[in-house]
């Protein structure tokens, strides 16, 4: 078992050793390689400037991921350990026997805190070609990778789609032109929603106004599905599909 720890920013000199000490009993022999990234954010005014992310490669090809933020290093390590156990419950056979029956009581992770609107910027633009999969497979990725949303191409309707949680055990899928093909027999049921046509500045203005952690929309000029979302540094990032658009004539 190998736990690689990388750091960024000013952190305690023993941070990597403390993280390994807490995670080693949890990961055991079923996780041959895990990567942890510890970061202290430099933006002033953040209440939770410490961020940790773990990516666990499990035997059998499975992966799980978790990301947490905290005000202190001790809280960060504790939250990371608890969240890692919670994520590994998706594959309970990899957990030590004493942890399989452990019920975590953490509430859902809090969304990143935002800087005041005047100080926010879109600091990252990322494009990806969505992978074709079913809605159920997309939910599995969403949960295992601890994503707030997941961009994919729905296998049957062949539409770019974004899936998000809409409550405990409930999910919503956004599409530019909602098509229920492939969603009729899903369990749990999935709500289908339209990704409204919008410009990027309009999406930024909505998040500035509402303080919401994410805005899903269809970019007005390209017809591509996008997600504008809050980063842990208090700024915004933009994720968009780079797949070819067959019909980008705008809303109905």
What do the PLM-derived regions correspond to, one by one?
Residues 1-252:
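N-terminal, polar/charged subdomain of small-to-medium soluble alpha/beta proteins
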